[in-house]
């Protein structure tokens, strides 16, 4: 396989890390932000073009958020495991290990997606019942969920393919594929809903079709690349050792994300008791604040991948330098995004809801949570640093304790004593701060740069 680095790929093993981190991270952030915007377009279209059914249609799409989030986040975590395993193998210059991991990831994504699709048809109705979806919304929500779950093979395939591209330092190809499929998604939404007069079924079909296109585009690119991650149909099989390694790193990260989603469902249940205005305000604010999270999380993903390759290459000092620069550059990017969002908060909130009361309450959420993203940056970068070394269980358990444990306990014991929106919001900086301290302690205890110092090669970062 070819070893030259193309313009859209990043050489993580040599040269300046300072210049390369943002080249990796910013397309990842743009991809996540585009996904948010395309999802918002789904809601906007059913909310404006489904006539008398628009209220239940919007509610049906929203009601499925927690379920879809749990499933997709679980597998995105596993895809991160594939990213690390492939990056390690690339750093070791072990093309055979890369080949086994790549083909294992592709097959696992399709088979895992098929299993979820089939199981989902059986448990979709009970899951929606657990969430207490209103009777008038239930049939629409069930229809949307069943169609969406049928598309899980292609949805998961895209995420695993994107992880493969990122492992070689290519974040632009997944972004381009998503942009193409996203535009197609919007066009299909308009066609199905306006022309064919469909409701949530049209939006769900459009989403699945668009994901199929993005997955197909990346698959074709992988079959034609001259890099070591090239996919060959005859080699598509699961390698037991590769799968075990992928799951050992990815499953804790996936479970962490899934439990994280569950904790947020608990918080949402508390917000739901405060009335329609609070619900609308919180929803609008979330759509604003997630943009800053996408920015900081992109540097965490960059840190994981850079550390993964350099750890595989035995360049341990470069791993530590990657973590330090990820902090610095991530802090700069996060600070800028937080300041911009806070200064334009009321205008951005008005895009989702122009009610002055909704905007006022939404601003409370933004003013409380966005400054606390300094803690989020700390634990995301440090978690990414540990995962790059293959240490995944510890950050997952500590995040579950710090984020999930505190949030669930807060809603159960603190919120009942002062049932206000601000009381609910205080749990975010408290839980994020506690988690940051826990992860920092874990890094100080593990000290990966010292633990793996014996693997250091003669090749030094110039």
Question: Where is each model-derived feature located?
Answer:
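Small-residue hotspots at the loop-to-helix junctions and early N-terminal turns
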Residues: 55-66, 141, 145, 204, ...
